[in-house]
Amino acid sequence: MEQFKGLQKTLYIWTDSADLDKRVEKVKSATGGEVALENVHRLSFSSYANSSFDLIVIECAQLTDNYVKLLHMLKPSGKLHLVAFIGPAGSLLQEVKLSGFINCREDADDALTAEKPGYETGSSARLSFAKKDASALNVWKISGDDEELIDEEDLLDEEDKQKPDPAGLRVCSTTGKRKACKNCSCGLAEELESEKQSKAATENAKSSCGNCYLGDAFRCSTCPYLGMPAFKPGEKVQLADNLLKSDI
């Protein structure tokens, strides 16, 4: 019991009341602190707070279902001392280890001693290997801090900003003369053909009433010059392209 010297608070769990005072006094003399008593059969009904004792001494330690509770009752690094146990020491030590105790051993006086870890049950600690290297993270950056950005204004010249002439975009316009190619696909062939038909229709337009030049008041309902101002007799008048075409 000398190994428990200096422990301030002890719980003594007893089974036999004979000479109980002597056994308790022995523990008190060895530790030099306070000793509380609890019957082994009343342990499951007790309501001790967590981390209440520095040492727990048990007689006849067949308490398989209560080792976890004893672990909670001990303070961090608290001691568990089993005396007068029944059965193989190896099996009992295995049960104590599985309950969360560490440094489990058999003493020379046919007793078993175990220790609670130096931290409270359910506590957490930061792990050093979880730190991330900032330089390693920068390797995967798409843009570095020293990369220069291109000025958007330098990408286009003044000539690029000028809108092109739609007529100059045609393939046929490269000849310098408004003449459609053999396999024209830019629409110039259709445009020239339309102008040709409009011109022919205008030249062949003849007045059936002879009053077309006088104005709309003297023109018939189908006059091609309807809507145009009056003109001199014999004067050539250019009609619009859509006047001689069907509306359908």
Curated annotation (Swiss-Prot):
Segments carrying motif Cx2C motif 1: 209-212
UniProt short sequence motif Cx2C motif 2, positions renumbered to this chain: 220-223
Chain segments carrying region N-terminal SAM-like domain: 4-129
InterPro entries to which the protein is assigned, alphabetical: Anamorsin, Anamorsin_N_metazoan, CIAPIN1, SAM-dependent_MTases_sf
Statement: the UniProt record of this protein carries the keyword 4Fe-4S: yes
UniProt superkingdom: Eukaryota
Self-association and partners: Monomer.
Protein name per the record: Anamorsin homolog
Taxonomic source organism: Drosophila ananassae (Fruit fly)
